[in-house]
Amino acid sequence: SAKLTKHVSPLTKPPNNISPSKKRRHSPEGPISSRLKRNIKPVIQLGRSSGILLHITSLPSPYGIGDLGPEAFKFIDFLVETKQKLWQILPIYQTNSPSPYSGVSAFAGHSWLISPDKLLDNGLISKDDLISIDRSRFNQSYANFQQYNDSIWSEWPESLRRREQYALKTIRELERDRIEYYVFVQYIFDQQWKDLRKYVNDSKIKIIDDIPMYVDYDSADVWSNSYMFRLDHNDTMKPTFVAGVPSDQGPNKGQIWNMPIYDWNNDNVRKDLFDWWIKRLHKKLSTVDFLRIDHFRGLIAHYVIPVDIITQEPNTTEAYWVKTPGHEFLTAITESLGSHIPIIVEDLGDLKPEVFELRDHFHLCGVRILQMGFYSDSTNIYAPHNYIPNSVAYTGRAHDNPTILQWWTEEASDKEKHQFIDYIRRPVEGDKELINGLELEKHLDKHICWYFIQILFQSAANGAIIQMQDLLNSLTRMNIPGTESDIEYDGPQNWSWRFEWSELTFDIRIRLKELTQMYGRDLTYDKTISSEDMALKNDSTSSLD
């Protein structure tokens, strides 16, 4: 695995000569608006299709990590060759760490993804292009934040910490060049992203992006909207609660995310918070085709973990659930952006019936994880025979789970293995023990990933996504939750995995294409289904949710 070390280019850090340093009215929670009642609009739904989950940083690259350059275009050609219709990526926000989920702005693209090859090909930009930049399109809070981001914002001078206007004006004047630099970097990112997306869409492929539920404390979002978060507003401005999840009923352990909690239930800020989310979703949907909202369960109730104001240590023994105004929130979203928003929701974790009721009320597309389908009985909603059309099914749980091969050889229980074997064997005598003369378990140690892919593609879920590591039968996972990369450690680091083109053999390409065509996932993706038809389709399995 390559370490996450990016080349030093003119755009990854400021040049040495730069000094360091109207509200909408929303419907109250309750029945859907009369406008939506009168018009049963088509709900955007993925047609029967398949694709690959691969973050941009995992593309091959001579520069340390993958970027928006030639290798990304080559990957699109591979998707076309194998009849794939979907490319799912992880968040592409600017971060100060390898994790794509630790963004310093929910509105700024990541400068590490800028392609040096394309900069060379384009000769950067002309003076005319620079003059014509519409600066209002770029996130000014992010530019202001970055120019002073040598320390966490709660340690800045009081006037900047609380965003007093005279202090902001002074900084803008004193650090004009540095702020303009960050605006310039965002311009370059936007141009390269537009070029790639046009190629993707011209190739009849859709991009799915992940949008985290929470944002980092040390971010432009929290700094510029601190009143919308549960912070110590009287003194330190540090979080009084952080987000996380307890252990659920499946194989997943609890987590502490150390991200501040939105002040969802404060009547004085709720409308502004909704507006911020609307702008965030609108921005993302202008750059990708579908959004997968992480931790959808948090819109029913969010798990709050108290923290010590002085030490900032989380206290999980006193953590608890707090109701979230999710219905009101999604009503505001649909009234502002339309009822046909292309959203996929991660309806996983410690789920209650209310989660599925909220999802289905707004006709949102859910998620199914095949790796979680064999630890329970036949009513397990993650078992492939229980998938519904309006869902996207994955081989594994994206970035936080072991790869299929690692799960099978290192983590799966005997019960899970036996249940999987019973699930796939044909009903003929002797088949349980032998396949082509080999013992079945030994056979599966070698071919488990292809069995998973075939079962996934056979399912009723309209979307089927393969994690790239699973396609390559790899043991290397993307991330281990609750751990951080260690630069002193010479082994695989979180978020550092990259594939090589030599791994995508002719056999893999042919087999993937054949399975895609065999199970009808190479057809058109621009299908819609009315909410009435969807109710009929899902009715037979809705009780499982």
List the model feature ranges, each with a label.
Residues E71-Y93, T287-V288:
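Catalytic domains of carbohydrate-active enzymes, especially glycoside hydrolases
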Residues I208-P212:
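Gly/Pro-rich turn-and-neighbor structural signature
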